[in-house]
Amino acid sequence: MNAIKFLTQNEAIVMDQLLMGKKYAFSTDSLMELAGLSCASVIQHVYPTISKKVLTICGPGNNGGDGLVASRHLVQFGYDVNIYYPKRTDKELYHNLVTQCKHEGIEFLESMPTNDQLNNDYGLVIDSIFGYSFKGDIRSPFDTIIKDSLNNIKTPIASIDMPSGWDVENGNIKNLFTPDLLISLAAPKLGSKSFKGKHYLGGRFLPKEFLKETNLTIPKFNGSNQFVDITNYQN
């Protein structure tokens, strides 16, 4: 496997800005669509048969948007998905994503399921609360969701880009939950080096010239795959 560069928080922010600048001309919605599709593809690969429902917990930013897109694609793949999206934004992009999900028949929950419900009624919980831009304290209602629910349930958890609440560069310094599956997007973040579960890289959208300009090294994607397994990668 080719070498992999783990990004600092600032590197991830700068690269995202470059990707969406005039030179490379990507838009937020196009990147979100590709990221969400890759997340759904990883989940279908790792959990091909889930007899129970899937719950996606969405945060207010782009990571939550990735979760909305992934949920829509999972329904297309045959999964039964619920979404809990407690803190929404007024931006049109997110309104559109919610509308698209509703037209797929996805139910948006009014309240967070209890831990018993999560353990008994759901076969997978998707954590799309916070991504690479997270820093500082975990605020309501996500502090309760993470500390009271995700920290204590037995249902498998799949985190998008970073496990929510982890320090992007230093990892799980707050002793929070560890997901069963982590789907890093574009390139893994420095804080995920300590992650010991199933680890996949998604977000297959970086142009060759972009990789050269940024000296970013990522593994090769095979064929038309939207992801690559980096679980056994050793630095």
Swiss-Prot record:
SUPFAM superfamilies with a match to the protein in the record: YjeF N-terminal domain-like (SSF64153)
Residues reported in the UniProt entry to bind (6S)-NADPHX: 62-66, 131-137, 161
GO MF term set: metal ion binding; NAD(P)HX epimerase activity; nucleotide binding
Cited InterPro entries: YjeF_N_dom, YjeF_N_dom_sf, YJEFN_prot_NAXE-like
Catalytic reaction list: (6R)-NADHX = (6S)-NADHX; (6R)-NADPHX = (6S)-NADPHX
Cofactor note: Binds 1 potassium ion per subunit.
Keyword Isomerase: yes
Residue intervals of the YjeF N-terminal domain: 12-218
Gene3D superfamilies recorded: YjeF N-terminal domain
Enzyme class, broadest EC rank: isomerase
GO cellular component: mitochondrion
Pfam families: YjeF_N (PF03853)
The EC number(s) this enzyme carries: 5.1.99.6
Cofactor(s), by name: K(+)
Binding site for K(+): 63, 127, 164
UniProt keywords, alphabetically: Isomerase, Metal-binding, NAD, NADP, Nucleotide-binding, Potassium
Function: Catalyzes the epimerization of the S- and R-forms of NAD(P)HX, a damaged form of NAD(P)H that is a result of enzymatic or heat-dependent hydration. This is a prerequisite for the S-specific NAD(P)H-hydrate dehydratase to allow the repair of both epimers of NAD(P)HX.
Similarity field: Belongs to the NnrE/AIBP family.
NCBIfam families membership: yjeF_nterm
Name under which the protein is recorded: NAD(P)H-hydrate epimerase
Originating species: Dictyostelium discoideum
